[in-house]
Amino acid sequence: MAPNRERIAEDDLNLPYFHGALMNQDADQLLVNEGDFMVTSRTVAELNKLQFHLAVRLKKGIRRYEIKRNATSAKLGTRSAGNIGKLIDSLKAETIEIKGEKVTLKRAIAKGKFQLMHRDVNFKKQIGSGAYGTVYKGRLAKNNAVIAVKKLDTEGTDEEGLADMMKEARVMQLYDHPNIVKFYGFILDDFPYLLVLEFCNGGAVEDLLREKPDLKVNRRVQYTYMASAGMDYLHKKNCIHRDIAARNCLIHNGVVKMADFGMCRATAVYKVDLSKPLNVRWLAPEVWNNGETRFNTDVYAFGVMIWEFFITPYQSPYHEWKGYTVKQKVRAGYRMPPPDGMPREMVIVLNECWNHDPNKRPTAEKLKEKLEELNQKFEAGDASVLQGPEKSSDPPTNN
């Protein structure tokens, strides 16, 4: 924790309408009717100080008024009280004028089901790191469920870090599926800011593939099918994942779950900045033309992940090339040869995912159906699916 970090008083934390560092765009979605209100906080990094605001919807839009807070009082305009709760109670008693506008506080907006508090979680053991912070293993206080906690390491001084964290929170709270990592909520009432997720006891698929090069083909097929079910669910929810890879699939009790939604967008088309770092090895060739990512660019990335699931021993895609070379080769039509031991039917699926024409790639739904059928054949012991790919010096077709 940063030295001399100002803490939020317990009586302020306990206010049902105190939403902590909830970002304005999220708060605005909750302030629906005239008179709806909440209290939020933010850190002024250069002063290392907390600021509190009363956010309220008026006829002309949402207003935010700073509440002056110290150890013994809270003040807004000419009104003051011993703390924020008492101040709000006095403001609710009548219509008041603030900065020349009539303000009536009608309905206090309470925290939603995904807005947890620090007292709701316990965590100590660090298990990894993510794009914007450290990941810990912990438990939910209410039911002792094992959780993974992503901690924003910048302690509220980095607005961009908080924005990235909340992008992930916004999309994850929309989804509930066995092959998607479960989202429990976010914590913004005080520092540190946290995301709370299901803990997956099997770790990342990539790590498993590295540790177990002798993993049986039927298990690899099963993992591929389960991942496709997760992608199909996301696409039906109008969401592009944009970061599909073996490292972003986790395993819990043998079930593969798609994870890491930091790049996920709830839209059918999302334009990326081609000047910024990209996951070149998983990127569909057409993205380099206009920067547009779509459902079929996810499918292309899924094809690369299929290759990851079957290469033995595990290695990164195009591991012998630098990113620039990968970009050139893939745009020119090159695709990696299928790994030895990959079932013929899986090779067909792989090539379909890698079709140079994005419109000829299978949808996530069709992909899931094909992989479900293949998985069922393996479960039934169908000998015909055990044959590996035919040897060929040619790359997969781009027809």
Model features per residue range: what roles?
Residues M165-R170:
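Regulatory alphaC helix of protein kinase catalytic domains
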Residues G185-F186:
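A short, aromatic-enriched beta-strand patch in the conserved N-lobe beta-sheet
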Residues H235-I251:
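Catalytic-loop of the protein kinase fold
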Residues D190-A204, L208:
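Conserved short submotifs of the Hanks-type protein kinase catalytic core
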Residues M1-Y132:
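Domain-scale recognition of modular recruitment/scaffold domains used in eukaryotic signaling
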Residues T134-G156:
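Glycine-rich ATP phosphate-binding loop
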Residues Y223-T224:
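Activation segment signature within eukaryotic-like protein kinase domains
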